[in-house]
A protein has these predicted regions:
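Short, solvent-exposed mixed-charge patches
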Residues: 136-139
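Active-site region of chymotrypsin-like
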Residues: 11-17, 44-134
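Conserved active-site neighborhood of the chymotrypsin/trypsin-like protease fold
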Residues: 1-44, 128-131
Length: 139
């Protein structure tokens, strides 16, 4: 678990499936696919284009505190609530990122990059401490 990057890693030793491979960062212009349950609906895999890569710092919605700086993709994509935490895959099915947000207007989404994901996994992937689920808020 990495609260600074807003990531949770789940290990299920008895699951009879191989985990997805985390690859290298995608480049600007790359065609990718992101997956999730948009708007709480059924599972969907949708196309996106990496518009660019940059560094950003987000604000924790619970505390108002600035989170760690992280490298992110800006995606031309119809990201919706329910896609957050879902993988971004390249054409080979390799994980190149994880969706974490969208712009307030238009079809722009944001995802952490593979390098940010690998760093968070190396730093906090074995952390088994309990974490707060946060409070429910009206949207």
């Amino acid at each position: 678990m990495d609260s600074e990057q807003d990531l949770a890693f789940i290990s299920v030793p008895t699951l009879p499936l191989k985990p997805l491979t985390i690859g290298k960062n995608a480049s600007a212009g790359s065609l990718v696919t992101f997956m999730g349950y948009p708007k709480g609906g059924p599972f969907k895999a949708l196309p996106a284009t990496v518009q660019g890569i940059g560094n950003t710092q987000t604000i924790d919605a619970e505390t108002g505190r600035a989170n760690a700086m992280r490298q992110v993709y800006q995606l031309a994509a119809d990201v919706q609530h329910g896609n957050s935490g879902g993988p971004v895959l390249d054409e080979n099915g390799t994980v190149v990122g994880v969706i974490f947000g969208k712009a307030t207007s238009g079809q722009t989404g944001y995802a952490i990059t593979a390098s940010t994901l690998k760093q968070a996994l190396a730093e906090g992937g074995n952390n088994t401490a309990a974490v707060s689920t946060g409070s429910c808020r009206k949207q």
